[in-house]
Amino acid sequence: MSRVSQARNLGKYFLLIDNMLVVLGFFVVFPLISIRFVDQMGWAAVMVGIALGLRQFIQQGLGIFGGAIADRFGAKPMIVTGMLMRAAGFATMGIAHEPWLLWFSCFLSGLGGTLFDPPRSALVVKLIRPEQRGRFFSLLMMQDSAGAVIGALLGSWLLQYDFRLVCATGAILFILCALFNAWLLPAWKLSTVRTPVREGMRRVMSDKRFVTYVLTLAGYYMLAVQVMLMLPIMVNDIAGSPAAVKWMYAIEACLSLTLLYPIARWSEKRFRLEHRLMAGLLVMSLSMLPIGMVGNLQQLFTLICAFYIGSVIAEPARETLSASLADARARGSYMGFSRLGLAIGGAIGYIGGGWLFDMGKALAQPELPWMMLGIIGFITFLALGWQFSHKRTPRRMLEPGA
């Protein structure tokens, strides 16, 4: 086996272990934020939405800067620094009793993510061969789902005792992850050339096809981020207990572990990437529309199940498209900018979703936020269809297995 092949194989295992630690650390804390501050402390949902939206926008919106810096200086220092910064954010969150302190903790958490997320994504593109990326992204997403359930279960159990224990556990996991990277991650370059920060950013911004694709996905992310805000609140409201939230993540894990990889393997040779992305988005949009009208957990979990199936269909295609469009001369910059749609959509989804949720309660129209999200999903579906027309998008990007 050549040294390059050996490095790729070892790199796969490193990426999987690293991803599991990051997912566990994140999901121990973040799914419980809305329950802690809205249901337990009585804050308005929009206040928590601002905090979550701020974290999302800082992490993803500034990702191009984190990626460009990683292109210049390498992945390792950015990843280690970012993970320690997120640990500090979680520690601060544990003592947050005023909105400004929660916002500051989410700012720290997001800034840490800005530093470590783009280089981690670029390492996947660097270490995984193009023909294997779709399946590897599916494995990562299966791992994300399992880690989400384990993290949410652990966080829900700790929340019975003290929210500070929840935050301390998340912080410890990110400190462990920082040590793991500091010890084992080689000083790899992300790009084929050591690209200056400004040059990497310029290269991305001049790629109109990539920019359009990323910005169009903002509507997709407005729906996707509700698993952290409105869906946990809805489950808690109907069940009357935050313990029921763990079953929401259990549903996601079961569906992902049983369906994600088989669907990706089966569909990659039969359907074009844009068809898979759009089909998943359509299912997600349809499942959102009736959520505000359900009256029991069985109905709600059925719709959540449909939402997750849509995500299982869409996510591998979305990640593969983003990776396939990245210029090898500026991988970090491209993968950082690819998060901008999540920054915009996530911020609007959290803040706007929280505001609509409060408004729906005030007007006695609980279906209002869910109807709006469904409509946004349909608009995004049409926008993607327009973008993916043959007149606008090169065929190579869309072929099965691309």
Curated annotation (Swiss-Prot):
Coiled-coil segments: none
Membrane topology, Periplasmic segments: 34-98, 160-164, 235-243, 298-299, 361-367
Cross-referenced PROSITE patterns: MFS (PS50850)
This protein's UniProt keywords: Cell inner membrane, Cell membrane, Membrane, Transmembrane, Transmembrane helix, Transport
InterPro entries listed in its UniProt record: MFS, MFS_dom, MFS_trans_sf, MFS_Transporters, Multidrug-R_MdtH
Ranges in the topological domain labelled Cytoplasmic: 1-12, 117-138, 186-213, 265-276, 321-339, 389-402
Transmembrane parts of this sequence: 13-33, 99-116, 139-159, 165-185, 214-234, 244-264, 277-297, 300-320, 340-360, 368-388
Subcellular location: Cell inner membrane
Cellular compartments per GO CC: plasma membrane
Signal peptide (from-to): none
Annotated membrane topology: Multi-pass membrane protein
GO molecular function annotations of the record: transmembrane transporter activity
Family statement: Belongs to the major facilitator superfamily. DHA1 family. MdtH (TC 2.A.1.2.21) subfamily.
NCBIfam families noted in UniProt: PRK11646.1
Record-given protein name: Multidrug resistance protein MdtH
Designated gene of the protein: mdtH
